[in-house]
Regions:
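Metallo-beta-lactamase
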Residues: 91-95, 118-210
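Conserved beta-strand segments of alpha/beta enzyme cores
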Residues: 2-4, 48, 75, 108, ...
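Active-site HxH/HxHxD metal-binding segment of metal-dependent hydrolases
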Residues: 33-117, 202-206
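Active-site neighborhood of phospho(di)ester-bond hydrolases with catalytic His/Asp-centered motifs
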Residues: 28-29, 50-57, 76-79, 127-130, ...
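Short acidic-hydrophobic surface loop/beta-edge motif
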Residues: 6, 18, 112-118
Length: 210
């Protein structure tokens, strides 16, 4: 599996380009900005973009999705519980002093337990509300990788003080869903360095059992 991870935009959102070497199909997860870099990587690996997946509708994760759709024709997938946040993109842009990206057009809602297929690569959607109502993670069992969006970080968790956030919900999502994964699972958070489920289970102050 090809997996390129790189920070984009003023808030350093971790964007993932995932490709199947046998079929040359690709996914892009959280294209928040710098779409030229995404397109360059797709071209470099000779990949055809099949789907654009957004873990949640905060501008730093979804801000470049429409531009990527225009460039490639690939559909945008996002959980429907975050559609309301999409209508606030101009407001979100003002929060961080960024230019408004314009409206995003979502092609399909991704739901809990949906299968994401990219050639021979299979991912499973996990609905993990808390950071936002529609926050999702994508788990790739054969690769033991979790694209966590802003649900889990190395040593921390997603903030819950923005519209749609709930501390109780994110803790439930983490305890019931995310920590059910094997300790060896590599976590690709929405920002910052990679970690593992085992490391977070042992040392994350929000998750350590007292």
């Amino acid at each position: 599996m090809i997996h390129e991870i790189f920070p984009v935009g003023m808030l350093g959102c971790n964007c993932s380009v995932i490709g199947d070497e046998s079929t040359q199909e690709a996914l892009v997860i959280d294209p928040g900005d710098e779409i030229e870099r995404v397109l360059k990587l797709l071209q470099q690996h000779q990949l055809k973009l099949k789907q654009i997946i957004v873990t949640h509708a905060h501008i730093d994760h979804v801000g470049g999705a429409m531009k990527l759709k225009w460039a490639t024709g690939a559909p945008i997938l996002l959980n429907k519980e975050d559609y309301g946040l999409l209508k606030m993109l101009d407001i979100q842009a003002a929060w961080i002093g960024a230019p408004p990206p314009g409206a995003d057009e979502i092609d399909q809602s991704i739901e809990d337990q949906d299968t994401i297929q990219c050639g021979t690569i299979t991912g499973t959607v996990m609905h993990t509300p808390g950071h936002t109502e529609g926050s999702t993670c994508i788990y790739f069992p054969s690769e033991q990788k979790l694209i966590a969006g802003d649900t889990l970080f190395a040593g921390s968790i997603g903030r819950t003080d923005l519209p749609g956030g709930s501390f109780n919900k994110i803790i439930t999502s983490l305890n019931d869903r995310v920590l059910a994964l094997p300790d060896e699972t590599v976590v690709v958070p929405g920002h910052g360095p990679l970690t593992t489920i085992g490391e977070e289970r042992q040392s994350n102050p929000f998750l350590v059992k007292r």
